[in-house]
Amino acid sequence: IIGVVGSLIVVYAVGYMYGYHKHRKDVRDNRRYFFMLLFIFLGAMFGFVLSESLMWIDFFWEVTSVCSFLLIGYTREAEAIRNSFRALWMNLLGGVALAVGIVYFDSAVNCVSLHKLIEYAQTGVVPAVIGVALIALAALTKAAQLPFSTWLMGAMVAPTPSSALLHSATMVKAGIYILFRLAPAMGGTTTGNVVVFVGGFTFFMASIMAISQSDGKKVLAFSTISNLGLMTACAGVGSHETV
């Protein structure tokens, strides 16, 4: 998704941003800055999915959060700035939960391996179970699950390539990715049940909101959130079949 869809979005953005600034004279033409953010964002996403160390996962997580903040606020308009800060604090809230989970697990077992975290959690080691719960909470914010989905709607004010990158391509998938990585440790647990409930509720509510919209971008956003909710619920079940 990152390499193929992300690359296609970047190629599309070349022509789109040319036309965008041709028609939006009120927005400062800073395309080099825009594309720099896109490439940093994609690089951070690659680092996120390829990392086994929880420390590196946390680092790349925060890089994507900062990039999304800057991309949403690209136009420097009042609405864009307001929505960019909303996205920032919601994603940083998840980042705090992720960091606390990692630090707590590391302080207890002296390990920052995601694989080891899952292994320990499956055997019922308390620090690992708590770590999984906190990281799952962080993933729910990144995956735009209710009630954390408002930042995703606010991303609509950004130029289409960045909103597409944030919506349908990569950033929200980071939360889904980490939930699926944690799925073996969540099956049949309280954390898993909470994730299933949040995902199912998001799927149902976002589906209703999607069919009631008349704006194409909002239909895309709510339908994306709905499908993310379905994937979240499947990850929470934790069985091989649902994954």
Task: Describe the residue ranges of each PLM region.
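...captures the hydrophobic TM-helix bundle architecture rather than a specific catalytic motif
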Residues: I1-V243
